[in-house]
């Protein structure tokens, strides 16, 4: 076995050990480990299930803590094993074991990089679930088809990340595609991963709806906002909200359109409109719609507080709702983020939900 290869593997293991130690420090391993024990203790108390909301919140907290604590324990354990095996394999010149350690080290590197990525989540709401609003721009069928492509893209992305995702509301286009859709995404750091996707997405392609096969440009907008938990008080005057019910239709509504189960809330002072038609129960749709309204009002307040600062920081104004963030030029096989300048030629993979590199670039650059 060549010395250079062994030295390289030894250096990688040493580097991973240093980074794992740093991870424990800035992810507050000791604090989170103690908190996990506390949460597990509460969940073992049979009386906790008398309060379903409290039990569910504890279950979510446990899952979030385990994602950090158990992963850090796994990294440390496997690193210790790899270092011990490496010393023995080097002495015995055991090629097969060295190859196995090299493979294990690459897997450990992915784990460490994944945990390091959490440092990018600087927004206090990053750990929350979130909602995604998709809206077709002007341009009729072409824009509505583009909106449906984005809907599919983000559904696939959420599946790849292991997030639970559901379509709360969808308004279909007259010929093809969708006019609007709202998704609810549940998972660890769902908002943190998706928040930089807010903005206008531009598509350039030869249109399948044009008999002359002409080149068309379409726009669709995304708005991502965090779910707000009960610890944050959002004061909504019921008198300011108009409640309409209607029969659900389209995806999510095929089996629930015999009664007026869909719910639309209109908040007068802000002009915000939310709607939910995902469930057969009008009561559950109404509860989900109120959660959406609460989340949108919270996000509106946060944006208002930041508006003066954003005016002063011209370099950051392109992250707003009304600005292009990404360009998809399909006939040139090029997708480019206009904020980070990251681009790729693998358009099929991106449209199939492979957004990790775009999101990583945005978070690293503080978009």
From Swiss-Prot:
**Where primarily located?**
cytoplasm
- Which GO-annotated molecular functions does the record name? translation release factor activity, codon specific
Which PROSITE patterns does the UniProt entry name for this protein?
RF_PROK_I
Q: How is it modified after translation?
A: Methylated by PrmC. Methylation increases the termination efficiency of RF2.
One Pfam family, short name: PCRF
Q: Which domain of life is it from?
A: Bacteria
Task: Report whether Coiled coil shows up as a keyword of the record.
Answer: no
* Record protein name field: Peptide chain release factor 2
Q: Which HAMAP family match?
A: Rel_fac_2
InterPro entries in the record: PCRF (IPR005139), Pep_chain_release_fac_I (IPR000352), Pep_chain_release_fac_I_sf (IPR045853), PrfB (IPR004374)
| Protein's cellular compartments | Cytoplasm
Q: What is the lineage of its organism?
A: Bacteria, Pseudomonadati, Pseudomonadota, Betaproteobacteria, Burkholderiales
Q: Which UniProt keywords apply?
A: Cytoplasm, Methylation, Protein biosynthesis
GO cellular component labels: cytoplasm
Record SMART domains? PCRF
Sequence similarity: Belongs to the prokaryotic/mitochondrial release factor family.
Main function: Peptide chain release factor 2 directs the termination of translation in response to the peptide chain termination codons UGA and UAA.
Which residues does this entry mark as bearing N5-methylglutamine?
254
């Amino acid at each position: 076995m060549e010395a250079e290869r062994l030295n390289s593997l030894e250096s990688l293991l040493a580097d991973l050990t240093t980074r794992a130690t740093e991870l424990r420090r800035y992810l507050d391993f000791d604090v989170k480990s103690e908190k996990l024990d506390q949460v597990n203790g509460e969940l073992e108390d049979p009386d906790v299930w008398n309060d379903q909301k409290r039990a569910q919140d504890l279950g979510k907290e446990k899952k979030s803590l385990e994602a950090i604590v158990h992963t850090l324990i796994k990294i440390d354990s496997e690193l210790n094993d790899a270092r011990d095996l490496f010393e023995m394999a080097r002495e015995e010149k055991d090629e097969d074991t060295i190859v196995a350690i090299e493979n294990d080290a690459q897997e450990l590197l992915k784990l460490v990089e994944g945990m390091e990525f959490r440092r990018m989540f600087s927004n206090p709401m990053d750990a929350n679930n979130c909602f995604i609003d998709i809206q077709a721009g002007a341009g009729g069928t072409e824009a509505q088809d583009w909106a449906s492509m984005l809907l599919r893209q983000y559904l696939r992305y959420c599946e790849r990340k292991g997030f639970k995702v559901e379509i709360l509301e969808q308004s279909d286009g007259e010929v093809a595609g969708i006019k609007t859709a709202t998704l609810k995404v549940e998972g660890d750091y769902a908002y943190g991963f998706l928040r930089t996707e807010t903005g206008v997405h531009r598509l350039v392609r030869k249109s399948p709806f044009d008999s002359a096969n002409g080149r068309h440009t379409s726009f669709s907008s995304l708005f991502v906002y965090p779910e707000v938990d009960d610890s944050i008080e959002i004061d909504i005057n019921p008198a300011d909200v108009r409640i309409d019910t209607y029969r659900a239709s389209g995806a999510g509504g095929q089996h629930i359109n015999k009664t007026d189960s869909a719910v639309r809330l209109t908040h007068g002072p802000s002009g915000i409109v939310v709607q939910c038609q995902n469930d057969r129960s009008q009561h559950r749709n109404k509860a989900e719609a109120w959660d959406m309204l609460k989340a949108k009002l919270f996000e509106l307040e946060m944006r208002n507080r930041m508006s003066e600062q954003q005016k002063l920081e011209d370099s950051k104004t392109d992250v707003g709702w009304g600005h292009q963030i990404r360009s998809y030029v399909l006939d040139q096989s090029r997708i480019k983020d206009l904020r980070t300048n990251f681009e790729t030629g693998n358009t099929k993979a991106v449209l199939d939900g492979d957004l990790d590199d775009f999101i990583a670039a945005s978070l690293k650059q503080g978009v």
